[in-house]
Amino acid sequence: MNKKQKNKIAIKHQFPTGILVLDNKTVFKGVGLGYQGSATGEVCFNTSLTGYQEIISDPSYAGQIINFTFPHIGNVGTNNEDLESDKIWTRGAIFNSEITSPSNYRALKTLDEWLKKNKIVGLTGLDTRSLTNFIRDKGAPKGTISNNKNGIFNIKKLINNSIKWPGLN
């Protein structure tokens, strides 16, 4: 990791730049990170305290949007040794708090840079506990996660994407 990357600070946004829309029309707004675009999948949660890079690259999460419940994510950064596979299987990643700057000597990229490189849509600033409780009580919904720096979203289209997604087989 170079000096420029270490000195990056998070930018506070005045409006939502990321959104999660569930198939039951529930909408969660936050700040987008990672790849700008949209992805649809099954929304699940993970309660691990560590290992976010391994989780995102784990084939068992294929087709899923992972809601991370631990609030401090990103402090290890990303590297080439902490991958579960050569391919990224996850469709999206949701975090409660802003991504922490990496402070690990093995870090090659920030989590945000790594998500962008691997075309994974990310979202921060959500009440991940509320989403986790929803999933626990109602089951894993289909959802569409979207990241747009302009904060403009076609919610009707995102709901339809979520509803029409065939699900995991």
Model regions: which residues?
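RNA-binding accessory domains that recognize and position tRNA/RNA substrates
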Residues: N2-N169
